[in-house]
Amino acid sequence: MSKEKFYITTAIAYTSKKPHIGNTYEIVLTDAIARFNRFIGKDVFFLTGTDEHGQKIQEIAENEGITPKQHVDKIAGQIKDIADMLNISYDKFIRTTDDYHVKAVQQIFKKLYDQGDIYKSEYEGWYCTPCESFWTETQLVDGKCPDCGREVKKAKEEAYFFKMSKYQDKLMEYIESHPEFIQPES
């Protein structure tokens, strides 16, 4: 008889700046959940890792006079060292710059693009560079970023979008018939 599978992941830590207590807090809580589920007999797969792409990373690397890869190698190493020092029981530490990850994402993207699930368009809004977030006019607080309070700038960028509407009915049906699918319940 096969064990019930349980998949858990942290948000993958962003590598723009050195690790902080929030990274540690999240991974420790996730580790506790993974360990508990192993203890009760589930087949657990626990994923954590680092997100190593973004405008902020590029700007920081340029200011430091190094490549973005050199910058993220340093920060990702620190994040992994902390997880290992805390004896976190992850099964996989993924880095978005790992060759196998890049190739897998490219294959998935191409398949989705070829079947019409991804399309290119433009997005326009108020952009906060430190937060790497777009905001609408109504979300701004006194014309500033609602998260950090800094100035925002009007920006327009070409981007790829996923046609979620194509799958909405099936996804909603699945979530409603499998309430345990997304946890914790919001």
Predicted feature descriptions by range:
Residues M1-S186:
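N-terminal, positively charged nucleic-acid-binding surface of large information/translation enzymes
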